[in-house]
C-alpha cells in the first residue's frame, strides 16, 4: 500500500506535507501530487517534527491547495539513462520535453549518487585539442578534467560554450550531455536546432531547467544531466563530454532554497552549505578506470568579482580556469579570454612539451610587460619608450589581436567564416611572431584570422587596397 500524506502549508516552492505517524518518507525521496491532469514532483528536504516533512517543488506550485493528497514514491528523483536518451531533451525529473516519445522501459537511475571511490578514480594528462588558439596555447584543457569559463554578463561565455560543443563534439565524435541550468530558454532552443543541423544531436542528450523554473528544478537539473553522463561512463565505458551552462545558477538556486528553508545565510547572503553542495556535484565529475567525463562549465561572475563566494568556491575544483575579461571584449577582441588571469594545471613542460611551454610562457611574458608599460604610454606616449620596449609593445599588440579568432557559431553575427586551428599551426604561428618574422605586418592583419598565413594574406589585401585608393 502506498504511503500517503496531505499538504498542510504552501510557501511558494516550499510545500509542507503531513504523514501518518512512523511513516515519514526518507530525506531526498520524491513525492508526487496529481491534480487537474497535472503531476507535480516534490523532493523531501527536511523533517520538521510532528510527522511533517518540508519539501521543494520541481515545478510551479500554482493551483495547489491544502489537504491535497501526496504520494511517497519511496525513491529519489530518477531520470532515464542509456542510449535511448540520445537526441532527446529532458526536464529535471527526466520527462521528455521535445514531443518525441522514448521507450517507456528505459532504465532509470537516481540523481543522487555517491562519487567514485579513490580506488576507482584514475589520473590523466591527455590534452584535449579545442581548435581555439588562445585556449590550446595558454590554457590547455585535459581530457577527463573540469574546465571553468568565468565571466560577467555579456562577455561571451555561452558563445564560447557553443563553439566548444561544435569543435570538440564534432571532432571527438563521442557522446555529450548538455545541462542548461537557469539560463535563457531561447538559447536552449537555438542550441537544440544548431545541434540538429550539425548532426551532433544523435550523440547528445540535453537536460534543461531554465531561469523561468522554480529554484528546486534549477538546483537539481545539473545532477540530472550528470547522472546521464555517469551511466555512459560507468556502464558503456565511454569518454563523455558534459557541458553545464551555468554553474552559478545552480548555486543561486541553492541560495534561494536555503532561504526558503529558513537556514541562516553566510557570506554575501549565500547558503551556509555552499561548499558542500558544490563538492557533491563536482566530485562526481571525474575519470574512472571505465571511462571519463570531461566537464566544461560556464560560471557567471557577479559584478565581475572573482572573489565572490560562488565563483571562488567553483575555482578550487577545476583543472583549468578560463577567465573572460570585459576590457578585452570592449576592444572588440573575441573570445575575450584574459591570457594572464587564465590558468591550467596542464601548462607544464612535462605534459605539453618543452617547446609549447616555452612559447606559452614567452607570450605571457610579453603581454605582462605590455600591461606594465600601458600606464607609461598613457601619460608620456610611445616616444618615451626605449627601442626594446617599443618592440615589445608592437609585438604584444599583434599577439593580442592574433589571440582573437572567428567562431563557427558566430558566423551569422560576424559574417566571418569560423576556423578550427590545429595546435601545431598555433605553435608555429606564435613562434614566428615571437621571433620577429612578422614585425613588418600591420597589427590589424592579425585580427580575426586563423593561421599566420591568413594574416599575411589579409595584410597584402589591405596593402593593395590602400595603394589602389591612393
Swiss-Prot record:
It catalyses: ATP + H2O + 4 H(+)(in) = ADP + phosphate + 5 H(+)(out). NCBIfam families: atpD (TIGR01039). The lineage of its organism: Bacteria, Bacillati, Mycoplasmatota, Mycoplasmoidales, Metamycoplasmataceae. One of its GO terms (molecular function) is ATP binding. HAMAP family: ATP_synth_beta_bact. The gene is atpD. This is ATP synthase subunit beta. Its EC number is 7.1.2.2. Its main location: membrane.
Amino acid at each position: 500500500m502506498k504511503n500517503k500524506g496531505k499538504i498542510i502549508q504552501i510557501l511558494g516552492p516550499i510545500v509542507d506535507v503531513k504523514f501518518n505517524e512512523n511513516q515519514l518518507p526518507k530525506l531526498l525521496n520524491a513525492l508526487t501530487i496529481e491534480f487537474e491532469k497535472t503531476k507535480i514532483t516534490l523532493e523531501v528536504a527536511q523533517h520538521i517534527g510532528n510527522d511533517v516533512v518540508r519539501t521543494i517543488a520541481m515545478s510551479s506550485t500554482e493551483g495547489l491547495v491544502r489537504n491535497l493528497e501526496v504520494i511517497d514514491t519511496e525513491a529519489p528523483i530518477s531520470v532515464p539513462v542509456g542510449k535511448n536518451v540520445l537526441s532527446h531533451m529532458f526536464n529535471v525529473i527526466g520527462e521528455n520535453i521535445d514531443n518525441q516519445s522514448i521507450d517507456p522501459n528505459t532504465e532509470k537511475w537516481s540523481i543522487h549518487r555517491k562519487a567514485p571511490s579513490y580506488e576507482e578514480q584514475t589520473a590523466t594528462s591527455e590534452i584535449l585539442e579545442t581548435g581555439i588558439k588562445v585556449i590550446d596555447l595558454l590554457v590547455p584543457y585535459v581530457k577527463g578534467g573540469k574546465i571553468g569559463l568565468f565571466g560577467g554578463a555579456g562577455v561571451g561565455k555561452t558563445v564560447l560554450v557553443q563553439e566548444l560543443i561544435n569543435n570538440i563534439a564534432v571532432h571527438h565524435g563521442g557522446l555529450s550531455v548538455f545541462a542548461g541550468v537557469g539560463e535563457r530558454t531561447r538559447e536552449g532552443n537555438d542550441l537544440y536546432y544548431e545541434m540538429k543541423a550539425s548532426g551532433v544531436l544523435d550523440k547528445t542528450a540535453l537536460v534543461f531547467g531554465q531561469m523561468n523554473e522554480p529554484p528546486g528544478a534549477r538546483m537539481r537539473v545539473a545532477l540530472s544531466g550528470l547522472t546521464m553522463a555517469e551511466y555512459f561512463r560507468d556502464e558503456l565505458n565511454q569518454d563523455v563530454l558534459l557541458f553545464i551552462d551555468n554553474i552559478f545558477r545552480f548555486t543561486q538556486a541553492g541560495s534561494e532554497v536555503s532561504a526558503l528553508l529558513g537556514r541562516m545565510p553566510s557570506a554575501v547572503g549565500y547558503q551556509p552549505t555552499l561548499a558542500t553542495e558544490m563538492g557533491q556535484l563536482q566530485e562526481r565529475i571525474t575519470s574512472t578506470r571505465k571511462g571519463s567525463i570531461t566537464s566544461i562549465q560556464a560560471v557567471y561572475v557577479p559584478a565581475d568579482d572573482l572573489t565572490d563566494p560562488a565563483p571562488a568556491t567553483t575555482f578550487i575544483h577545476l583543472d583549468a580556469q578560463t577567465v573572460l575579461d570585459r576590457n578585452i571584449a570592449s576592444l572588440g577582441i573575441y573570445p575575450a579570454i584574459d591570457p594572464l588571469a587564465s590558468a591550467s594545471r596542464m601548462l607544464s613542460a612535462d605534459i605539453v612539451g618543452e617547446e609549447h611551454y616555452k612559447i606559452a610562457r614567452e607570450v605571457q611574458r610579453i603581454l605582462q610587460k605590455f600591461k606594465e608599460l600601458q600606464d607609461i604610454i598613457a601619460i608620456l606616449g610611445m616616444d618615451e619608450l626605449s627601442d626594446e620596449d617599443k618592440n615589445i609593445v608592437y609585438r604584444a599588440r599583434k599577439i593580442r589581436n592574433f589571440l582573437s579568432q572567428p567562431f563557427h557559431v558566430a558566423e551569422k553575427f560576424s559574417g566571418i567564416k569560423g576556423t578550427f586551428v590545429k595546435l601545431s599551426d598555433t605553435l608555429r604561428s606564435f613562434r614566428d611572431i615571437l621571433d620577429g618574422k612578422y614585425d613588418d605586418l600591420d597589427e590589424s592583419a592579425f585580427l580575426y584570422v586563423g593561421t599566420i598565413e591568413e594574416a599575411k594574406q589579409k595584410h597584402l589585401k589591405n596593402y593593395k587596397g590602400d595603394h589602389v585608393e591612393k
